[in-house]
Amino acid sequence: MTTRQPLYKSLYFQVIVAIAIGILLGHFYPQTGVALKPLGDGFIKLIKMVIAPIIFCTVVSGIAGMQNMKSVGKTGGYALLYFEIVSTIALLIGLIVVNVVQPGAGMHIDASTLDASKVAAYVTAGNDQSIVGFILNIIPATIVGAFANGDILQVLMFSVVFGFALHRLGAYGKPVLDFIDRFAHVMFNIINMIMKLAPLGALGAMAFTIGAYGVGSLVQLGQLMICFYITCVVFVLVVLGAICRAHGFSVIKLIRYIREELLIVLGTSSSESALPRMLIKMERLGAKKSVVGLVIPTGYSFNLDGTSIYLTMAAVFIAQATDTHMDITHQITLLLVLLLSSKGAAGVTGSGFIVLAATLSAVGHLPVAGLALILGIDRFMSEARALTNLVGNAVATVVVAKWVKELDEDKLQSELASGGRPITDTRETDDLGVAEGPAPSIK
């Protein structure tokens, strides 16, 4: 029988306390709060430092160790099908809610009076994101460049190709696979060390947010924020909840299982900060490494449910606030554009806001200057986006793993029932995401 660790040693508790302290510091001592921004930035940079090698190790080890290469293509196909269906539902829900609630109605803002210079940089970056450009950008100019820039999709593409090539080498490639497995141990140990700094990162990021923007900015456009937050909660509990029930598990138990990762995302407003831990958690939940390695990184670009809800709601809100008429044709056009543009929301600084700028420019009917209306509260809305995206990718991983019969359902139910152990718990040798002993044989 193991002794339960004290509450104060739990990362879950430490991050909650850090967020609370950050809010108080930012509110009562705003200058101090703003000065703490480097804590949050530094923590996120530390995480990003190891994301690329962790994705590489996980994907290569998973693919190279598979017996049947057809299953990789099958997994990718099912994942993209799931992503497209669920993200479309998210876009539709956002569109329906914003039309029913109409949070921007009655504001009567003249778009010509808005300061478009505040959003000029976002519009420029958004216009640079074409569909063809996005697809071509998945192919790295150099291998080193993909890792140096930390571009998730470029690293993922190279990792898949490398994994296939290593598998084709058979026994000759086994020493390379052994090295990659051991290198993965080192990377996940680094993550464990970095995660001890998560409370400091959450404190700094939250103190800066409240100190820089103030609690008052939460009230100014509160109706849109409340509407968006409620919609995200309903989407998770109803839509994702129904998907989970249909596949034999509970979304509430899944949320409880990834509670530490959700708190880290809440504190940093960056879903990337939880990516390495999600790779470990989903594999521990019973999904095969090959599935986890493909679905989680790909989902960070193609399965952004929270961002999808935000994009439709924000676009129509701007139309309502500026008294810009949008009939059913305009809204269908908006939806079709977002079905494409929303897939480019990852790997770009200020991703959701930039994609929104690109969408408004592409639709043409909506005033791009209207982005200035939500620029001040976008930082607060990004937290709900990131949390919803994280839960969505966790659900996607389990569902796709079940579809391709790469899910240990007994392990799934056992882990969900227990609520999950902290990742720093070393009672099992595979807690670092890689099994001890020799690498899997390559046939």
Swiss-Prot record:
Topology term for the membrane: Multi-pass membrane protein
GO BP terms in the entry: L-aspartate transmembrane transport
Region (Disordered): 415-443
Transmembrane found in the keyword field: yes
Assigned keywords, A-Z: Cell inner membrane, Cell membrane, Membrane, Symport, Transmembrane, Transmembrane helix, Transport
Chain ranges passing through the membrane: 10-30, 46-66, 78-98, 130-150, 152-172, 199-219, 224-244, 291-311, 332-352, 354-374
Lineage: superkingdom: Bacteria
GO molecular function: fumarate transmembrane transporter activity; malate:proton symporter activity; succinate transmembrane transporter activity
Family annotation (SUPFAM superfamilies): Proton glutamate symport protein
Matches recorded under InterPro entries: C4_dicarb_transport, Na-dicarboxylate_symporter, Na-dicarboxylate_symporter_CS, Na:dicarbo_symporter_sf
Record's keyword annotation contains S-adenosyl-L-methionine: no
Pfam families: SDF
Localization per Swiss-Prot or TrEMBL: Cell inner membrane
Free-text function comment from the UniProt entry: Responsible for the transport of dicarboxylates such as succinate, fumarate, and malate from the periplasm across the membrane.
PANTHER family: AEROBIC C4-DICARBOXYLATE TRANSPORT PROTEIN, PROTON/GLUTAMATE-ASPARTATE SYMPORTER
NCBIfam families: PRK01663.1, PRK13027.1
Protein known as: C4-dicarboxylate transport protein
Organism in which the protein naturally occurs: Pseudomonas fluorescens (strain ATCC BAA-477 / NRRL B-23932 / Pf-5)
Gene responsible for this protein: dctA
